[in-house]
Design a protein with these regions (language model features):
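Gly/Pro/Ser/Thr-rich low-complexity, intrinsically disordered segments predominantly at protein N-termini
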Residues: 1-182
């Protein structure tokens, strides 16, 4: 399927679909924990970004990413875009930060998406957030390289210097009760 075909299909579709290298993939529903974590991140970022050109988006706005001989369209769980000229109605092309909340069924895919996302020169931070335990993995652009950092304590603070924000793991996981059974 071509890009224009996908965009027309997706606009009329009742369910969300991602577009990768010409293939269309249906998006599965998410758990309660996934939704709470995504909302916690988006709400806190929205509050911190007031008065700046940056805006936080959640789940239903696509991110267009470059790919070999094509483009991909993903639905990040939370995305922050700061370029006012990046204003397509249904997607953003130049996110500064992308968050993916991991689930057992999507973890490998979300980790793999980073290979595509990192081709976007606007992206400064790619953040993977576990919903099983307090754990955040941050990929941070440093020139031509990417630096990795992991946070595992709820008192830890995630510095999002690219957008002038900070999130503690306590804020990210507010309302989540972790159990050994998960």
């Amino acid at each position: 399927m071509g890009v224009e075909e996908y965009l027309a299909f997706e606009e009329a579709a009742e369910a969300r679909h991602e577009y990768q290298f010409g293939w269309v993939y249906a998006m599965a529903g998410a758990s309660e924990e996934h939704n709470i974590i995504s909302l916690n991140i988006a709400a806190e970022l929205r509050a911190q970004l007031r008065g700046t050109p940056c805006r936080a988006f959640m789940a239903d706005l696509k991110c267009k990413t470059p790919a070999v001989n094509s483009v991909n369209f993903y639905y990040p769980d939370v995305m922050v875009a700061c370029d006012p000229s990046d204003n397509q109605r249904y997607w953003r092309e130049r996110p500064a930060v992308v968050f993916e909340v991991l689930s057992r069924s999507t973890q490998r895919l979300d980790e793999h998406k980073f290979l595509t996302y990192q081709q976007n020169p606007a992206l400064q931070l790619y953040v993977l957030v576990s919903q099983e335990k307090p754990f955040v993995r941050i990929m941070r652009r440093a020139g031509e390289e990417w630096l990795y950092e992991e946070l595992k304590e709820t008192a830890a603070v995630l510095n999002l210097e690219a957008i002038g924000c900070q999130l503690s793991l306590a804020q990210i996981y507010e309302g989540i009760a972790f159990t050994a059974a998960k």
